[in-house]
Curated annotation (Swiss-Prot):
BP-aspect Gene Ontology terms: S-adenosylmethionine biosynthetic process
Catalysis: reaction(s): 5'-deoxyadenosine + H2O + H(+) = 5'-deoxyinosine + NH4(+); S-adenosyl-L-homocysteine + H2O + H(+) = S-inosyl-L-homocysteine + NH4(+); S-methyl-5'-thioadenosine + H2O + H(+) = S-methyl-5'-thioinosine + NH4(+); adenosine + H2O + H(+) = inosine + NH4(+)
Binding-site residues, Zn(2+): H57, H59, H205, D294
Gene3D superfamilies linked to this entry: Metal-dependent hydrolases, Urease, subunit C, domain 1
Known cofactor(s): Zn(2+)
CDD domains, A to Z: ATZ_TRZ_like
Organism whose genome encodes this protein: Methanococcus maripaludis (strain C7 / ATCC BAA-1331)
Family: Belongs to the metallo-dependent hydrolases superfamily. MTA/SAH deaminase family.
Subunit structure: Homotetramer.
Function (record text): Catalyzes the deamination of three SAM-derived enzymatic products, namely 5'-deoxyadenosine, S-adenosyl-L-homocysteine, and 5'-methylthioadenosine, to produce the inosine analogs. Can also deaminate adenosine. The preferred substrate for this enzyme is 5'-deoxyadenosine, but all these substrates are efficiently deaminated. Likely functions in a S-adenosyl-L-methionine (SAM) recycling pathway from S-adenosyl-L-homocysteine (SAH) produced from SAM-dependent methylation reactions.
Keyword tags: Hydrolase, Metal-binding, Zinc
Keyword Transmembrane assigned: no
Listed name of the protein: 5'-deoxyadenosine deaminase
Remarks, miscellaneous: SAH is a product of SAM methyltransferases and is known to be a feedback inhibitor of these enzymes. As a result of this inhibition, organisms have evolved efficient enzymes to metabolize SAH via different pathways. The pathway found in methanogens differs from the canonical pathway, it uses the deamination of S-adenosyl-L-homocysteine to form S-inosyl-L-homocysteine for the regeneration of SAM from S-adenosyl-L-homocysteine. 5'-deoxyadenosine is a radical SAM enzyme reaction product which strongly inhibits radical SAM enzymes.
Amino acid sequence: MILVKDAIINGKKQDLLVEGNIIKKIGNISISEVSKDETEIIDGKNCVLIPGLVNTHTHVPMSLFRGVADDIPLMEWLSGHIWPMESKLNEKIVYAGTLLGTVEMIKSGTTAFNDMYFFLDSIIKAVDETGIRSTIAYGMIDLFDEEKREKELKTARKSLETIKNLNNSRITGALGPHAPYTCSKELLESTNTLAREYNVPIHIHMNETLDEINQVVEKTGMRPFEYLNSFGFFNDVNTICAHCVHLSDSEIQIMKEKNIFAAHNPVSNLKLASGVSPVLKLLENNVPVTLGTDGCGSNNNMNLFEEIKAAALIHKGVNLNPVAVTAKEAFEFATLNGAKALNINSGEIKEGKLADFVIINMKKPYLTPKENIESHLVYSFNGVVDTVVIDGKIVLNDGKMVTIDEEKVYELAEEAYLELTK
């Protein structure tokens, strides 16, 4: 068990008891109510306890791509830099990159993430060791080639079976067709079939740039969401669509009707000059918005607090509206909405919820005065957290990783980077 004493929880000073992996009780809890020998007691004085953040779109192993190709347009960035480097990937490199990325996320308050990438056995191994929660998809790209398509679908099915057989509630599977402009109709149709067979979500890039939208329109005569909807891609599945930058009104209606989650990646979209997602229109149409960092190659970090701040600021600026995307809304994008998108029983601090939470020491200049903590967490916090609990286990204590040797992670990452760039 874990007992957190005297922390600010849901706006007031109280205690929190974890039993197993569940928040058992919130309120005034005496130490005499628990067994001292079986309970880890955390002093929450001068601290705020918040839900763990949920990163709904990323490519975690790309933590090794940090800073390698800055200030370049998306298509040139992909074809001239990222894809050539990815051709050198192997299990060892992906393992090292995933370790580095998960440590970065945990140390900045993220307790769960939604990933699409390659070498999934290496990702699973790193996730298992660090203790983070994850939904993992193999990134499928067939480039309209039948032989490649069959290979990609076979790999995706094998990955789902591997994750299913883990019997690890922290690690779940998803299907990750890259995007409509890189995947054939046949692959996309098979994706929906597999998602329903395995009861897993679909994670896909949608409408990130004008160029890719034009490619789909030229090929099909329809915009991407219209095209996918025409053959039932969104039917009877939970779909998380990353980016959603350039959307028509009809596409937003499809998102609303099909209960699609938008994974908003404001920093990545700004860095690659892709544009700004019409989040206000999405909210007006009751389309749920979540937050993602994207990969470090286009961000260049995995600090979701930066995405929260960016989401709260950019829509005020582009809409000339100071109340567009409030601090509360932006925070919920990264907590409650993200948890709903990944079907995780978390995202808020309530009895009966999973014990995925973060403790932050408020004795910091940027978190003072403490009376305005909700504002501070969105507009002034730098993301450096003190304690992280995931699935009822302490994985970060006093800013230090508990589950793995952090120095070894940095050593492996440097070695992997040298191999990747030689």
